[in-house]
Amino acid sequence: MEIKITTYVDNEKVHDEKYVGEYIVENTYEKIQYIDKNEKKIKIFIDKMKESVSIEKDNSKMSIEYSRKSSEYTTVYGIMKLDTQLVKINKLTRNNLVMHEIIYNIFFDQEKQQNKLKILVKNSGN
């Protein structure tokens, strides 16, 4: 599958990346996994029952739920403790395309930033 990930921070587009990876759909979850440009295995797990998202990289996992949650997550700056809160998850499908839009807040002391991931999965078999 072709996977295109666009990252926005406070509504400003900051990254646009394309990868080949896997997209798995089950009754209770959807999973997107790929190897990023730094050769790190990334897993994005969308739990349909809990309405939550987790992003795994380098044996670290960021859990994003509607209630504010703390996680230790590997970033370009090293391992950081991040407080996150899910704002919204949207899913749109058309023909051989699936787009997930995940909007969440990251809190830094008294400040917060809003991140948005647009994940477009294209079934290359069509």
Which residues fall in each region the model found?
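N-terminal intrinsically disordered, cationic/polar leader segments
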Residues: 1-63, 68-101, 105, 114
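Edge beta-strand at a domain terminus
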Residues: 109-126
